[in-house]
Amino acid sequence: RVFRTTKKTFLKYITMDNNFDLVVIGGGPGGYVCAIRAAQLGLKAACVESRGALGGTCLNVGCIPSKSLLNLSENFHKAQKDFNQQGIEIEGIKLNIEKMMSNKNKSIQVLTKGVEFLFKKNKVTYFKGKGVLFSKNDIVVYESNNKRTNIKAKNIVIATGSDVASLPGVNIDEKNIVSSTGALSFDKVPKKLAIIGGGY
């Protein structure tokens, strides 16, 4: 529907506060760093992120949660196997996956809130919603509450990052066939697991 809006109508809803030198669409490691650096160099900068939390795939469903779970799993393995060989005997070791996931989520929240703090510190305006290009200088941000915000930018950087993609003929249901995102939110440890892909 935004593409049927006239230029005159669009400009009517733009205030001086929504005029920027640079708007970055995407709040991942590329996007938020770009917005912060632009602000540090004296530009009036904004960032649009649809996920609801800054940090992109890396902080939310990639590197950070992976490292958190790998670290906790390694500690469990050491307590089970390595400690006993070194003379440290521990009985009744159990894995509480619910607590592990809670720990992982707390780590994510600390880091994403840290990026929000950097935005405030460097005076980067943060728009939570989906950014849609109306023209080479005009953006509409659709928020989850159906609110619409119009933004004007002299320059626009698109840093939308990655998303989960299915393989041909393979339906990801997040139950039997899970994406990398789903694999970070298991409620129990699978007895058997085949992994397609060797990335982090």
Predicted regions located by residue number:
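Short, Lys/Arg-enriched N-terminal segments with co-localized hydrophobic residues
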Residues: V2-T15
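Small side chains
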Residues: A45-A46, A194
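N-terminal Rossmann-fold NAD(P) dinucleotide-binding loop
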Residues: G31
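Glycine-rich flavin
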Residues: D17-F20, R37-L43, E49-V189
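Beta1/beta-strand and adjacent pyrophosphate-binding region of the FAD-binding site
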Residues: D17-G28, K191-G199
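Aromatic/hydrophobic pocket-lining residues that form π-stacking "cages" and hydrophobic walls in ligand
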Residues: C34
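The conserved SAM/SAH-binding core of class I Rossmann-like methyltransferase domains
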Residues: I25, V48-E49
